A protein has these predicted regions:
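C-terminal segment of classical bacterial N-terminal signal peptides
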Residues: 14-22
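Helix-loop segments that flank and shape redox-cofactor active sites
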Residues: 36-38, 63-74, 89-100
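Cleaved targeting-peptide boundary
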Residues: 22-33
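Bacterial N-terminal signal peptides that target proteins for export
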Residues: 1-8
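Juxtamembrane helix-loop boundaries in multi-pass membrane proteins
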Residues: 76-80
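C-terminal amphipathic alpha-helix
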Residues: 34, 41-46, 50-67, 81, ...
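Short, cysteine-centered beta-strand-loop-beta hairpins and adjacent loop/turn segments enriched
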Residues: 121-123
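Mid-chain, structured segments of secreted extracytoplasmic proteins
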Residues: 82-119
């Protein structure tokens, strides 16, 4: 009975305003089909930010592989990975100033150095070392989230912290999986972590565009 009443009500409404409903429906359809248009400045920022964070995830991956296998290129990979943190810091200087960029690079360098300690401890079977490193990693993630959220209200601290924690979890899974020679789990963690890092890059780009719209009109 309720279903019948509902059908009758919908039918009555449709008969009463056929032309208005059709017009509204057509307009809604047009809006739904309207593509999102970015200015060139926005595209450039998103591409640059994605490149930087892709390097972050790729060179982190390369370091994990080299360090666990004891390859000769480990120190060189570490140098390149640390340089990426400086590049990310430099990328925000046009918006937040030199001091902020340098501070971000410092926090990210700490993030990488802690990761290196965790990899080393895991490789040697030092469970206490791994646990201690994970505590430091978590504290560093808190510092990063606090720093970034204080610079831009479009980067909520809770969202940043969640994104960073997920990044740490995927990276940890890579290390554990490689040590256990669970190659499928290792690759799955990397693939998901890679996609996640690009989402993080877009989150940062979107926040910058919202905070400084005048810089992205063309």
């Amino acid at each position: 009975m309720k279903r019948l009443v509902l059908i009758l009500a919908i039918t009555a409404a449709a008969v009463a305003v056929p032309f208005a409903a059709t017009a509204a429906g057509n307009e809604a359809q047009k809006m739904a089909m309207k593509p999102v248009v970015y200015t060139q400045a926005v595209v450039d920022l998103r591409n640059a930010m994605r490149m930087l964070w892709e390097e972050h995830i790729v060179y982190t991956r390369t370091f994990i592989i080299s360090a666990l296998a004891g390859l000769d290129d480990t120190s060189k990979v570490a140098e390149r990975l640390l340089r990426n943190q400086d590049d990310i810091g430099n990328a925000i200087k046009p918006y937040y100033g030199d001091a902020a960029g340098t501070a971000l690079a410092g926090l990210l360098r700490t993030h990488i150095l802690i990761a290196a300690d965790i990899v080393s401890a895991a490789k040697s079977g030092d469970n206490d070392g791994v646990a201690n490193g994970e505590k430091k990693w978590s504290a560093n993630a808190e510092d990063l989230a606090t720093f970034l959220s204080s610079a831009n209200s479009n980067w909520p601290k809770s969202s940043l912290r969640d994104m960073l924690d997920i990044h740490l979890a995927y990276t940890t899974t890579e290390v554990v999986s490689r040590l256990g020679k669970n190659w499928a789990a290792d690759m799955e963690a990397y693939d998901k972590g890679h996609a996640h890092m690009l989402m993080f890059a877009d989150m940062l780009s979107d926040g910058i565009v919202k905070q400084f719209p005048a810089k992205f009109t063309k």
